[in-house]
A protein has these predicted regions:
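N-terminal signal-anchor/signal peptide hydrophobic helix marking the start
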Residues: 9-15
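An internal, D/E-rich "acidic patch" concept
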Residues: 1-4, 65-126
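Membrane-water interface segments at the C-terminal ends of transmembrane alpha-helices
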Residues: 25-32, 79-81, 146-177, 205-207
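Residue-level recognition of transmembrane alpha-helices
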Residues: 11, 144, 160-161, 247, ...
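Hydrophobic alpha-helical transmembrane segments of membrane transport/permease proteins
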Residues: 19-74, 171-191
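Transmembrane alpha-helical core residues of multi-pass small-molecule transporters
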Residues: 14, 120-121, 147-150, 163-167, ...
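Alpha-helical transmembrane segments of integral membrane proteins
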Residues: 2-5, 103, 107-139, 155, ...
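Short hydrophobic, aromatic-rich alpha-helical segments embedded in or entering the lipid bilayer
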Residues: 53-85, 278-290
Length: 334
């Protein structure tokens, strides 16, 4: 247990260091965008005004309000202080609405869409890869070309393919939104059914993107394990094939858990693209609106939340991996 404790503390320290740099990048990157958001707000509010002095006063008022006229270092420490207290500021593009109000519902939509889809795609992909390695012949010959083809389709490509086929041509599913535009969010069966129907295309676009690569990886690892010396020895000793296969797939699964941790960031990025294409009311669509409106607080808040979701998912996967792989404890004990 001492070895695992050392492993846990090491991963926790890396999480804290990465989080610190995430704060810095989430503050700096939106401010590197061209344009002046305060000037855009002033122009929108002061439409029709011909008095340049009045417009300058408006500009100064909003620059003071948002703190954009303060030194960049002072802005950064103020940003850290506000975020620690759960205050992401006021939206530039939707003033005077607080950023936290905007992203509250978006987080729920994103979490409910992305993580079930990523985990489901990972499970299905690994199951298909294991079956292909074990059965070989026909199933393997069909699965491998399909998996290679699917794994090379980018996230936006898969989303567009499903949108065109099942949304535009067949009209089986709606093409945009999280629910019907004529509905108000309630717990009525009509609203719930609308959410389920709108959920399908974004969900399956993420699942299909995840399946291909996982199936290829699991097949390769399973074939390697099936040809290992301990499998041949076990068969020579007369151990039942079902028991041997259980050990084989357990060993083959360990690198796939690591692969999930490494690829979860890419998967989340692809899922955000799917949200944008389907106008799904998650963080991806909110982030797009923030970028279009040069909304520093909204962009910083959304990217920080996405980053933290990915970091925490990686951390949890690595901690679970340490529990299921005894080699981790042994290595840390040395």
């Amino acid at each position: 247990m001492k070895g695992y404790r050392k492993y846990f503390v090491n991963k926790l320290l890396w999480l804290l260091v990465t989080t610190f740099f995430a704060f810095i990048l989430n503050f700096i990157l939106p401010r590197l965008m061209p344009g002046d958001p305060v000037a855009a707000i002033t122009a929108r509010i002061a439409q029709g005004m011909s008095n340049s002095t009045g417009m300058k006063e408006f500009y100064q008022q909003y620059a003071d309000l948002f703190g954009t006229n303060k030194p960049i270092l002072e802005q950064f420490f103020l940003y850290i202080k506000n975020v620690v207290h759960g205050n992401f500021g006021t939206s530039f593009s939707q003033y005077p609405r607080p950023v936290l109000d905007i992203i509250k519902s978006s987080v729920v939509w994103t979490v409910c869409l992305q993580f079930p889809a990523i985990i489901f795609g990972w499970i299905i992909g690994n199951t298909l890869g294991a079956l292909a390695a074990y059965t070989k012949k026909g199933f393997d010959k069909v699965l491998m070309p399909i998996s290679i083809f699917v794994s090379n389709i980018p996230a936006f490509g898969m989303a567009v393919i499903l949108l065109v086929i099942f949304g535009v041509n067949l009209k089986w599913f709606p093409t945009s939104g999280g629910y019907g535009f004529d509905l108000i969010p309630t717990f009525s069966w009509r609203f719930i059914w609308s959410v389920i129907v709108h959920y399908q295309l974004p969900f399956w676009s993420i699942v299909f993107t995840a399946i291909g690569g996982q199936a290829i990886g699991m097949r390769s690892m399973s074939i390697y394990e099936l040809n290992a010396d301990y499998v041949k020895y076990s068969r020579f000793m007369g151990i039942k094939d079902r028991k041997i296969v259980g050990y084989v797939f357990r060993n083959a699964m360990l690198p796939q858990v690591t692969g999930l941790a490494l690829s979860v960031g890419t998967m989340v990025g692809g899922a955000l693209v799917a949200e944008i294409i389907f106008s799904y009311p998650g963080l991806g669509y909110t982030l797009l609106n923030g970028i279009m409106g040069q909304d520093y607080p909204l962009i910083s808040a959304v990217t920080l939340i996405i980053t933290m979701m990915v970091l925490l998912a990686n951390f949890i996967i690595e901690i679970v991996y340490g529990l299921i792989d005894p080699r981790i404890k042994a290595a840390q004990s040395d």
